Amino acid sequence: MGSLWSKISQLFVDAFTEFLVSVVDIAIFLAILFGFTVAGWLLVFLLRVVCSALLRSRSAIHSPELSKVL
C-alpha cells in the first residue's frame, strides 16, 4: 500500500511541476510578445521622427519655391 501512495504522490508532484513549467513558459512567451510590441512601437516612433525631420529640412530648402506656388 505504501508503494501505491508513493506513486500517487509522485504523480501529483509531477503534475504540479508540469503545471509550474507551463505557467513559466506562458510568462516567457508573453514577455517576448511584449518585447516585440515595444520594439515595434519604438521603430515606428523613430521612423516618424526621421521622416518628419527629412520633410522639414526639404521644406526649408525649397521654401522660396513654395512661397511662389502659394
UniProtKB/Swiss-Prot annotation:
Quaternary data: Homooligomer. Associates with itself into higher-order structures, including dimers, trimers and tetramers. Associates with the GP2a-GP3-GP4 complex.
Disulfides per UniProt: none
Virion surface side of membrane: 2-25
Tagged with keyword Lipoprotein: yes
Name of the coding gene: GP2b
Superkingdom to which the source organism belongs: Viruses
Main location: virion
Record protein name field: Envelope small membrane protein
Annotated lipid attachment (N-myristoyl glycine): 2
Membrane topology: Single-pass type I membrane protein
